[in-house]
């Protein structure tokens, strides 16, 4: 894998999506992640990708993704600390289902200027049909607990909604 990264010709990379793991604690109906490798991205691979994206010296976005990226929080922290040490002009983003957010994680993300997007596909009755826990029950309660952690810590977040035939007719706005 390292040799593949080294052989990529570097152009100005505007956005680097780091899929920190294929693992997820949910089993969403439409998700492709269940078909992917469930291994964790190593910190070495993550840092090599960041160096490649930073090579142009221009501002770029690093988005932590997955599966559920907070399942590999150690790699996320390593990247965040490395970006700070190197003073890379990176904008940091996390796309999460929110269920693993704790006060400690939320404060770390806030202090390190990691923007947070939480996935929610509509009102609970609709979201629970699309976003489910591994036991088959709806995940809305877990997602809302994560959003509450952010609210309690005065941390703003964005919401990401996957529009499907199940929710398109009931979304407002």
Where are these regions (language model features)?
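Short, charge-rich binding segments
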Residues: 6-10, 30, 85, 107-108
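Radical SAM/AdoMet-radical enzyme domain recognition
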Residues: 47-63, 72-173
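Short acidic donor-binding/metal-coordinating loop in glycosyltransferase active sites
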Residues: 20, 66-67
């Amino acid at each position: 894998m390292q040799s593949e990264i080294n052989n990529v010709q570097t152009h100005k990379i505007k956005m680097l999506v780091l899929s920190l793991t294929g693992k997820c604690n949910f089993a969403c109906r439409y998700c492709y992640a269940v078909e992917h490798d469930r291994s964790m991205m190593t910190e070495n691979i993550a840092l090599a990708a960041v160096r490649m994206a930073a090579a142009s010296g221009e501002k770029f976005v690093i988005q932590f993704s997955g599966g559920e990226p907070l399942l590999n929080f150690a790699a996320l922290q390593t990247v965040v600390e490395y970006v700070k040490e190197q003073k890379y002009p990176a904008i940091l983003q996390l796309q999460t289902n929110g269920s693993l957010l704790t006060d400690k994680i939320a404060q770390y993300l806030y202090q390190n200027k990691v923007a947070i997007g939480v996935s929610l596909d509509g009102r609970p009755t609709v979201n629970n049909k699309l976003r489910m826990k591994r036991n088959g029950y709806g995940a809305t309660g877990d997602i809302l607990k994560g959003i509450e952690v952010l609210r309690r810590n005065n941390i703003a977040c964005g919401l990401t909604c996957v529009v499907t035939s199940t929710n398109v007719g009931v979304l407002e706005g």
